Amino acid sequence: MTLQQQIIKALGAKPQINAEEEIRRSIDFLKSYLQTYPFIKSLVLGISGGQDSTLAGKLCQMAINELRQKTGNESLQFIAVRLPYGVQADEQDCQDAIAFIQPDRVLTVNIKGAVLASEQALREAGIELSDFVRGNEKARERMKAQYSIAGMTSGVVVGTDHAAEAITGFFTKYGDGGTDINPLYRLNKRQGKQLLAALGCPEHLYKKAPTADLEDDRPSLPDEVALGVTYDNIDDYLEGKNVPEQVARTIENWYLKTEHKRRPPITVFDDFWKK
């Protein structure tokens, strides 16, 4: 088995999908989890205005709607969380995403004050954060807020990780990667677009250039620039297609060096890191 085949198998990626079937699969997955653990009353998700959180948010709200209708349990809710750092450049996209999702509840937590306070406390301890590390601080502050909200609403935190993100480890460890349940896991980027199109999402929310937008020195840096490969390249690779050798090498290097991000903390029983 080639490394490409191993990666595809590990991430559960498929070369083709039926959008309606995958929508139903994710909704039923979320409903099944909530029904298995009836003490869970809320799904909590940060909404950025990008493709992934828009899709995950819509699926969460659909799952909650169906479960409320089936059980009559009005205490179930989906909580969409806006987590800007100061003023977000694409705030209108966030509002458009929320209008599309129609969440039960919307909370806004501006993380800038908390991030600056943490940075100052570290500075006083003799640690000056680089712009890149400050970006990770933002991602972790966002997740901290979501877990606080989940803790106070008997909820779980929903993630947006999918195959095209997992393969490169393009997420912050214990930031946006630190979630409870990931309904998009298995899909690549273009497949996520297919689901949103089937759901009637405004096109500009899934045709915009994806960006983590964590660095102050490089605001709205496109993911594809940071990664050195395009999402079309990554999607082709995950669909088992032949890609240029340099593209395959770049993707595989990302996969191998970020393996620790896709695993629990390393213990004496692990040996994957010895390769």
Curated annotation (Swiss-Prot):
Binding site for deamido-NAD(+): R140, K173, D180, H260, K261
Alphabetical UniProt keywords: ATP-binding, Ligase, Magnesium, Metal-binding, NAD, Nucleotide-binding
Gene Ontology annotations for the cellular component aspect, listed alphabetically: cytoplasm
Catalysed reaction equations from the record: deamido-NAD(+) + NH4(+) + ATP = AMP + diphosphate + NAD(+) + H(+)
UniProt GO MF annotations: ATP binding; glutaminase activity; metal ion binding; NAD+ synthase (glutamine-hydrolyzing) activity; NAD+ synthase activity
EC number(s) given by UniProt: 6.3.1.5
Residues that bind ATP: G46, I47, S48, G49, G50, Q51, D52, S53, T160, K189, T211
Entry-linked InterPro entries: NAD/GMP_synthase (IPR022310), NAD_synthase (IPR003694), NH(3)-dep_NAD(+)_synth (IPR022926), Rossmann-like_a/b/a_fold (IPR014729)
Enzyme type, top EC level: ligase
CDD domains the UniProt entry points to: NAD_synthase
Pathway(s) of this molecule: Cofactor biosynthesis; NAD(+) biosynthesis; NAD(+) from deamido-NAD(+) (ammonia route): step 1/1
Annotated positions binding Mg(2+): D52, E165
A biological process term (GO) from this entry: NAD biosynthetic process
PANTHER family assigned to the protein according to its UniProt record, in alphabetical order: NH 3 /GLUTAMINE-DEPENDENT NAD + SYNTHETASE (PTHR23090), NH(3)-DEPENDENT NAD(+) SYNTHETASE (PTHR23090:SF7)
Family: Belongs to the NAD synthetase family.
Annotated function: Catalyzes the ATP-dependent amidation of deamido-NAD to form NAD. Uses ammonia as a nitrogen source.
Subunit structure: Homodimer.
Protein name: NH(3)-dependent NAD(+) synthetase
UniProt source species: Escherichia coli O127:H6 (strain E2348/69 / EPEC)
